[in-house]
């Protein structure tokens, strides 16, 4: 494989929407998502009202890359070899002694090969994107509540209630029906929760188009919500930028399912219509599969093997399946790289103008892309040494997957928008260093020789 990657060499450029093309104002969107789910649990499922009270300190629990064991209510941070680096029961962190007794140096019981771990399971859930993270905090607090209520409850069955809360707020008809809390609030004040695309990104998209690239938008959001987001961040003429728009794509199934399992559907007034036996022309579609899409891309490019690159923020839904099943180039949007900037420049005493405050001004969430005091770095952690030996640093499982399945990782699309299209990025590969594919810089914890604070 070539050591470098260039957009100029790609025939097709595809994008995820949420947290990729559309960046959210995380200190506002995270409490909104949390509240959307918590209100449902309290009002519809009879959970304690205390779940609705969140302090700024509570948000430190949120860290991408955690696994929740749905049966025992434990959250786990995994090393690249599947051993447990840190763990909590609900929000309560385990001491090194309790951790050693519970997990030792063994592989976590559900740890499989990367392929197997990529799939959701009835036994665990991985938190790998910013839509999910507020749910991690909520689940942890539910475990705290149930443990206290039932005198040290050991096994749990709350997940079905979380799924019901997600369905209530995000189901296909929720946007149109103003159902739940999330969509009505985004509609009421999009500027509070969304960042408009910078002019540099809009210009870059047009530059790609003018260079003859086919542009795709593939999102699991439904068509009505997708339209609201794109009109806000890109303008009312956003459809001119994309040759093909695919909504309700149900990733990762879009990449992993057979065409017969997940056909494309046309849309009429945001309602899904009949299934299509194949994809014959550009346009706006719902659901679908990567196999039929690639057949159309062959026709559109006149090439037997058009080269596709896909930008996304979720390892589970975007990066792993696009690389593993479709063999596309993949660009991971990793806001944790922005967190490095934040540690240098953030001024917590700055507050928002009063006129920007609204219905959900509750305590601000810490920037979710900054390092958690409870969980440490997303990329690396220390393992306690045995007697008279030093602690050793290990890569996390999440960090390993970045270098395994991403072509490159960037903090945002804006970070590359002013580069020439033929710019040669150094890609992740087994022949390069572990940090080669991070642009513009690797995470501070991977590029410095500083010893991490021990657990």
From Swiss-Prot:
Modified residues (N6-acetyllysine): 171
Amino acid composition bias (Basic and acidic residues), ranges on this chain: 339-364
Keyword Magnesium tagged: yes
Pfam families from the UniProt entry: 5_nucleotid
Catalytic residues in the record: 16 (nucleophile), 18 (proton donor)
Cysteine pairs bridged by disulfides in the record: none
Region ranges (Disordered): 339-368
Keywords, alphabetical: Acetylation, Hydrolase, Magnesium, Metal-binding
SUPFAM superfamilies, per database record: HAD-like (SSF56784)
EC top class, as a word: hydrolase
Assigned EC number: 3.1.3.-
Residues where Mg(2+) binds: 16, 18, 313
Keyword Magnesium: yes
GO molecular function list: 5'-nucleotidase activity; metal ion binding
Annotated family: Belongs to the 5'(3')-deoxyribonucleotidase family.
PANTHER family assigned to the protein according to its UniProt record, in alphabetical order: 5'-NUCLEOTIDASE DOMAIN-CONTAINING, 5'-NUCLEOTIDASE DOMAIN-CONTAINING PROTEIN 1
Protein name in the entry: 5'-nucleotidase domain-containing protein 1
Source species of the chain: Homo sapiens (Human)
Lineage: Eukaryota, Metazoa, Chordata, Craniata, Vertebrata
Name of the encoding gene: NT5DC1
